[in-house]
Amino acid sequence: MTIKNINADLEERLNEIKDDVINHMNKDHAEANLTYVRALAGMPDATSARITDFDQFRVSLTAETLNGSSNVQVQFLEPLEKSEDIRPALIKLLKHARTRG
């Protein structure tokens, strides 16, 4: 199996869980999303944030401020190697964000 095949397989597995992860994070962890954009995306005045997408390298969010919304991306500290890595990667990213914010 080539690197390209491995990445395609991971992308497929991430797509299978993507909706559930995004819905869960936006419903149950809105404060974590806000911490990501405030501390790691350079938007300290953000009032809310929601995840819109993710891949093995980054999470994409829409951040709201009093001046409107912005789409931002925050890199994971390490690329995901398997779909099961998403939860620990988001937790690790949150812990990192808290040390920066």
What are these regions (language model features)?
Residues 1-101:
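Binding-site signature for planar aromatic cofactors or substrates
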